Amino acid sequence: TVERGEILGFLGPNGAGKSTTMRMITGYIPPTAGVVRVGGNDVTEKPIEAKRLMGYLPESAPLYTDMTVEGFLGFCAEVRGIKGADKAKAIDRAIDMCFLKSVRHQSVDTLSKGFRHRTGFAQAIIHDPDILVMDEPTDGLDPNQKHEVRSLIRRMGQSKAIIFSTHILEEVEAACTRAIIIDQGKIVANGTPDELKAKSELANSYVVSINGTESSAVRDGLGTVIQSAKVTIVTDKA
């Protein structure tokens, strides 16, 4: 369960089942077992009602490259049933939130990868959904663009329920209030980023490189100085 005001990171290696799970959550493929409910609606039995509540950013967001950014967002708004003055307001809000003002009237096929990603993000929030589902929203972005997307997710997470997938722990630490780790389609861990880090064998560990000294002597010395320390020699370097 993901509540309003919660940002859930969906963490796992490539091929763990993150994208497949998100497609089931958003109703694009039916689950083979179990039930997915969005706002109380079974996505299999009431797909339209469930999808009205969600914004979805797939890993490769489909964009109509012959449209301008404004035209594409206007089309997405109309598909969502937003028209007239409300449509104009929705477009302005999405463009402002995703920092698209400078390319508002630019054709999508001329955009950089970063701006295309923001345009995909904008279509996901065009109808101001209560729930956002995003598949690796920062994948392929440069460091500045990643920072902008993380900041946007944190801001929106104050009033929405957000799920986003990643295979990078740094993404979870930077934006999430809770994280689930999956492997081969199964949950292997569930907790806050700090709780998951504390469970790691490498939590509160340090790596020391030693040059020109006998590693065994240093290991023995550390064991004497810090009685509770566990010293592991990873690689001997003369």
Feature-to-residue mapping (PLM):
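ABC transporter nucleotide-binding domains
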Residues: 1-183, 189
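ABC transporter nucleotide-binding domain
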Residues: 149-237
